[in-house]
């Protein structure tokens, strides 16, 4: 598909018009990215074949970009083993290390996004990982956690002793 200039966008390309307006949206899931248990400690995200998986990720300065599952196939993520006592709250996070720029030869710049599970801490009253913990996990995955864009796609409570998510 080509991106053209159109009077409807006040002389801007449709991509420029979208980027100028993305700030009006909150970060989070726009459509899709349904999360469901698979086998054992694995969950599947998105790829239901009918809904495009789209989310808005945000950086530390509040700048935003979209994250898409362009394969439209479910993505499997395996969670860490359950704690032996108490429960914990884990997150599944999509991140973009360096926001991709438009390219005529690379459709949606595949490979520019990481998808990771961020473990919470087991406790009698567990809480989800905070921004600092998420950015530390992004850095451990090989990206620049201090500047990456990210979006939480799923929140999963892992009960003590669980071997099969339901």
Provide a role label for each language-model segment:
Residues 1-88:
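Glycine-rich, flexible loop motifs
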